[in-house]
Amino acid sequence: MEHTYQYSWIIPFIPLPVPILLGVGLLLFPTATKNLRRMWTFLSIFLLSIVMIFSIYLSIQQIFLSCIHQNVWSWTINNEFSFEFGYFIDPLTSIMSILITTVGILVLIYSDNYMSHDQGYLRFFAYMGFFNTSMLGLVTSSNLIQVYFFWELVGMCSYLLIGFWFTRPIAANACQKAFVTNRVGDFGLLLGILGLYWITGSFEFQDLFEIFNNLILNNRVNLLFLTLCAFLLFVGPIAKSAQFPLHVWLPDAMEGPTPISALIHAATMVAAGIFLVARLLPLFIVIPSIMYIISLIGIITVLLGATLALAQKDIKRGLAYSTMSQLGYMMLALGMGSYRSALFHLITHAYSKALLFLGSGSIIHSMEAIVGYSPDKSQNMILMGGLTKHVPITKTAFLIGTLSLCGIPPLACFWSKDEILNDSLLFSPIFAIIACSTAGLTAFYMFRIYLLTFEGHLNTYFLNYSGKKSGSFYSLSLWGKEEEKKLNKNFGLVPLLTMNNTKRASFFCNKTYKISNNVRNQIFITVENFGLNTRTFYYPHESDNTILFPMLILVLFTLFIGAIGIPFNQEGIDFDILSKFFTPSINLLHKNSQNFVDWYEFLRNATFSVSIAFFGIFIAYCLYKPFYSSLLNLTLLNSFQKWNSKRIHWEKLINFVYNWSYNRGYIDSFFKTSLIESIRRLAKQTTFFDKRIIDGITNGVGITSFFVGEVTKYIGGSRISSYLFLYLSYVLIFLMILFFFYFEKF
């Protein structure tokens, strides 16, 4: 075992050769490097698989032995200061390494097909390899300086991938926005690290926790300054994990390729903030005010993310706000001291959200040949609908991910979210009400995404102009009787998974639809069939095998990963696998907790949380399921139309919520008017002062000297006698001035 830990330092460096070789190859041998591009993909997956196997082996040892291993090397600067760097292996490191590698491998496999037609294919894989290296280095770091170094590398890789298509102004602006927002958090983190070193004199985690606790117990440090340093440490995770108010970069980060959106939201960028708070929790837990701030920021983010997701039209931005809300749950759990629940939800959410993002990428790929390659169209849920029969495997995978995120048993997120809701009830009734209400909102907006995407008809072909020039939007007809389509009778799961890419002429197949009378007069996007007056529509086709395979693996994770936190004791809920994994941390955070909970209490709490989720799903079905239009003609619903006053108030409330959500809570607008515009005005004034005043003085002296020289040259006429005359004149004037001042004194 000791032999295994001695080589743990190599974990971050195993995936590193690929980005280095790709960078050198593209600079020195671009043609040969591009011709071997599939080899680089295979090598990336192979090296990351080695790290995954190594991490699993370390995790098994952690479960049975529950030990912590640290190895450091000292780099002496002088007699007073020496910097130590090394690696730190504990349960948190092991489980984060497994999470990063498993999701990373699946995203790499997915990206091979998704990015196959992109000119930046190799650049993308170089960034991805460096991204995985940076994140693995972060989770294995033994001190705060190493953490900060890899923290910045993780941020740099995320900026490169968010702005991967940098020729698009929107992507470039999103990259800049992510960079500037995270600069605020990273600067706070740096100040917190320096302040903590000034107090304790150490960067090492174990020494830091011990010294910090002794200072608190013996009252040998200013508590206010200590709280300030701890808060500055927390500012970094606020920005990195998209917590309020530094969350504004996350929705715009969806301008990057979809595979990197899956990796950022599941296992790298946003998970880094949760990891750091979990790593520093023994430090935060001795300061109650900081714990309350962490939980408060978490609960605000939970509610804000859920409300902002309610009216999003972009499928990826809807999932992004969902990530923001779920990260708020994790931060809330950490603020309450529920270390196990937070990390459990981090694990379950990672696989569920990776599945949803990869599913959305499959949907976007299917829509691009119909609506074009503009993200405003291919990612717009309003133009989707009716994809169930066209992409059945993607639909099933997306549905499982949606149900998991809604908290439906026995899927993964049910077990972890239920624990957080129960802990919030013990922590604060107000926080519990908000957390439970948001669980219902989560079910609502997730099924809204699902229903708009897969149910009804393909809305691209049912787009109808409202008929009013002043209309601010196009009205959509979601209904229309569908008649028989030409389908491939041999279509099935096994042939789909075994076919080659060469067996498919394109990603899409041609299908002819007959339109019923109730939509006959609407305006359609049509393709003329070789001059014939026949309307032929192109419909999405299921994605290729290399896109579907990672999704199917993530489906298995979503179905079964919750088992690591499910208790199996017949008498009560005893410590499960995950609890054994985090035994040292549980003893630290819950010293007086009982080792089991009654099954009756568990079932009662689970029934309550599932009921909330089903209520949210029911509301979503009522509002977005296609058969809702027929219900409007029922007498029961028509009777509500008579209550005009109440209906008007209800519509005002709905419009307010819609505008709030669609405009991102007006937070971006507030930052733009109050902060960005002020900084721009200050920058313009500074530029004016620098160019007109500072440069004006300098340039004025130079220009004056130039003209004096020119005048002197003109008067002198290049004769020595003239120069002597001018020189004597200056001396005489100087003596007269001196003589005048001399007699003034007397």
From Swiss-Prot:
Enzyme category, top tier: translocase
Membrane topology: Multi-pass membrane protein
TM stretches of this protein: 9-29, 40-60, 89-109, 125-145, 147-167, 185-205, 221-241, 258-278, 280-300, 327-347, 354-374, 396-416, 425-445, 547-567, 608-628, 723-743
Principal localisation: plastid
GO molecular function (one): quinone binding
Recorded superkingdom: Eukaryota
Reaction(s) the record says it catalyses: a plastoquinone + NADH + (n+1) H(+)(in) = a plastoquinol + NAD(+) + n H(+)(out); a plastoquinone + NADPH + (n+1) H(+)(in) = a plastoquinol + NADP(+) + n H(+)(out)
GO terms for cellular component: chloroplast; chloroplast thylakoid membrane
EC number from the UniProt entry: 7.1.1.-
GO biological process: ATP synthesis coupled electron transport
Keywords, in A-Z order: Chloroplast, Membrane, NAD, NADP, Plastid, Plastoquinone, Quinone, Thylakoid, Translocase, Transmembrane, Transmembrane helix, Transport
Subcellular location: Plastid, Chloroplast thylakoid membrane
NCBIfam families associated with the record: NDH_I_L (TIGR01974), PRK06590.1 (NF005141)
Function field: NDH shuttles electrons from NAD(P)H:plastoquinone, via FMN and iron-sulfur (Fe-S) centers, to quinones in the photosynthetic chain and possibly in a chloroplast respiratory chain. The immediate electron acceptor for the enzyme in this species is believed to be plastoquinone. Couples the redox reaction to proton translocation, and thus conserves the redox energy in a proton gradient.
Self-association state and partner proteins as the record states: NDH is composed of at least 16 different subunits, 5 of which are encoded in the nucleus.
Annotated protein name in UniProt: NAD(P)H-quinone oxidoreductase subunit 5, chloroplastic
Organism: Arabidopsis thaliana
